[in-house]
Amino acid sequence: MDWKKGLKLAGLGLMMTAACAGLTGCGGKSEGAGSGKTAKVGFINGVSGGVASYGLAEKEGFDMAVEEINREGKIHMDVEMVDTKGNVQQAVSAAQKLIAAKKVIVVGPLISGEYKAVGPLFQQAKIPLLGVATTAEGLMDIGDYMFRNCVPESKNIPQTVEKTHKLLGYKRVAVLYSNNNEHQVSAYKTFKKALEDEGVEIVATETFADKDTDFSAQLTKIHNANPDAVVVAGYYQEGGLILKKMRDLGMNQPVLGDNGFMSPELVKIAGPAADNVYVSSMWSPDRDSEATRKFVKDFRERYNHDPDNFAACAYVSAKLAAKAMENAGTTTDSKKVRDALAHIKNFESAAGPMTFNNSGDPEVDLVLLKVEDGKYKAVKV
């Protein structure tokens, strides 16, 4: 669904609170909250549908953070999660529901297109919206109640290109991207400019659509163009299949991905074909930080597997929300919480020290990662 249509739905939704009645949320109450003041927090996520892998990882990280916060006792976070199924209309309905419930802050949503659709609602309601994995350009332009803790493409992708160009020395690159996904179209445009800025020749550009499963025609054309490297802007479902087909065709070039490639599901789908994939992320389990080491240890003990980028980002989001309320001295005044969030500086998070700039974007160091033997490993350039 086009996000502009989502905005129209959003505007109508403010006048139709009855539309919210059909949604169900998941409460986040925990024992041991101590004497902390209760904060009504919303969490817009996608734990089913096409984005479930990302959303379930986010839920794990978020749930763990909330339990830690409530156990500490300074603040008790009473969380209501709403599942959008990766659908813009569902996201709009979720926003209406959480606004009607007078949440002090809302974390999410997961998808950039959803954020664009619901952002104006929260801006109008004066409730801070803290995006988790929303990296598309223009989101922070919606208003001063908009934040995200994931580095935007305008910073992430150019660093991927700059570092891999220096590391690998490629001169000719082919690009393949999803043209019916707003986030990936935005990623393609950013990749294109970054490659041009590095003086790299783009020898082929091909497109696909979300939920496609056959990429033979596009990859045959790319194979014939004989690039030194391939850029793929897509989510893990299509990305994993693209990687497998590339390797089947004898294409062993390095692959540059965007935020959509930061999922263990990509490796599960692609298998050994995922090796030699490069992405940039603020999250790395190898980061030399006590906060990172503790998060990884606690997460492994709780879930019996390693955290990914999305789990880490959601964990950090919950901690940022709690820190903002603590600094604001309130769990009910959204304006004061918004102001406190905007003034967070050098917050020691599991993803590194974090500061919000004047636009609501995070200032945090990025790490270049390479998939080797099925693991995302930090690369020094």
What is the meaning of each model-derived region?
Residues 301-311, 322-375:
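Segments of small-molecule ligand-sensing domains
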Residues 98-110, 130-132, 174-177, 226-236, ...:
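Periplasmic-binding protein-like
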Residues 146-207, 229, 321, 325:
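An alpha-beta-alpha
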Residues 1-40, 71-72, 381:
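Short, low-complexity disordered leader/linker segments with a strong preference
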Residues 91, 149-172, 185-187, 214-216, ...:
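Hydrophobic alpha-helical segments within soluble ligand-binding/sensing domains
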Residues 42-61, 82-88, 111-112, 176-185, ...:
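Extracytoplasmic "Venus flytrap"
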Residues 29-33, 54-60, 72-140, 208-212:
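Beta-alpha junction/loop-to-helix N-cap segments that form part of ligand/metal-binding clefts
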Residues 243-315, 376:
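Extracellular/periplasmic periplasmic-binding protein-like sensory domains
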